[in-house]
Amino acid sequence: MAEVEIFQEVAGFYRLIPLQPLRRTAGVWFDNIPLAFLPRIDAIDRVIHRTGAVSPGPVGAVSRPWYMHPHQDDNLIVLSGRRDVEIYHLEHGRRSFTVTPEQIRDGDGALVYDGPAMLVWPREVFHRIVSGPEGSASLNFAVHYPGMDPRTNFNIYELDEAAGKYWLIREGFRDQNLPPPVA
């Protein structure tokens, strides 16, 4: 199989990694995920969104809050539907992508990559997603680092981009089916 390279990258903010086409036949696309870009896989998350789903959802008066994982890199592949993904980092600002199984577009609709690809953002990058009217399904290949705690990994934040500040508005474990902590 041909060697795959990173298509686009802003270090510490995001990467676009093409999938490796293995076979194209009538009605079938078969692609490989380039594992060379994953130091390891600590979790594989299957995420299904219904029509127009918003993640994270509103918290109190904050209609569009953000997730931020301090100890997890996300490696997102959209399998069906459309995901409008916004990412933000204090040093890099905000960037938006529309991710489908066949391509990635910039937030303004300009084609960024024509083909199946993985959108990657590292730990400490804020992110939020809205699914299209058809809903969406994805796989996320999570890479965990020391300090990863499932009780705080999905904390939800409000951002003040102008001031470069953020604060916790909902503890992530409150929305999860986690076992009770070990005493």
Named regions from a protein language model:
Residues 1-113, 133-183:
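Active-site region of the double-stranded beta-helix
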Residues 116-129:
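Histidine-centered metal-chelating micro-motifs
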